[in-house]
Amino acid sequence: ACHFRIMTDNPKAFIGLPEVNLGIIPGWGGVQRLPRVLGKSKALELILFSKRLTSAEALACGLVDKVVPAADLLAEATAFAQSLTKRPPLAVAAVLEGMSVGLDKGFDEGLKLDEAWTAKLAASKDAMEGMTAFLEKREPNFIGE
């Protein structure tokens, strides 16, 4: 599982879950994770029929977030990752944990966690830095505290 997915537009590149063709099911939680990304009907279609998708099809159904030329794939993924590292680490952690808990354990559990994170983040150095940087019209320098 991954939070973001970038795929090449190479016509030989496909994505799919072929395990049912072998008489087994997708490993590593594929049966549980795919419907959370695509919805039940599309996930069933891809898994039960071992359908392979081109990059355009994967993008259209939401399985990948972005399609780029093969020559740009590593640079694009690196730039994306570097951009993410500039985000406030505590807030990013809060969003990732809150979304996972909300999806896995339910809306109410997710809200409880959001409430706890909101209090923690409001008192953080990163929140102060973010607000100060905004008022001073400069880029923030987050430190994860």
Language model segments and positions:
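CoA-thioester-processing core
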Residues: 1-47, 61, 76, 80
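Well-ordered beta-strand positions
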Residues: 4-6, 45-51, 57, 66, ...
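C-terminal long alpha-helix characteristic of the crotonase
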Residues: 6-13, 64-112, 119-125, 141-145
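Hydrophobic alpha-helical segments typical of transmembrane helices
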Residues: 30-33, 42, 91-94, 114-117, ...
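Terminal peptide-recognition signature
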Residues: 34, 58, 95, 134
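Short, structured loop/turn "capping" segments at alpha-beta junctions
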Residues: 41-44, 53-60, 88-93
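Short acidic-aromatic low-complexity motifs
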Residues: 49-52, 125-129
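K/E-rich alpha-helical interaction surfaces of small helical-bundle regulatory domains
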Residues: 129-144
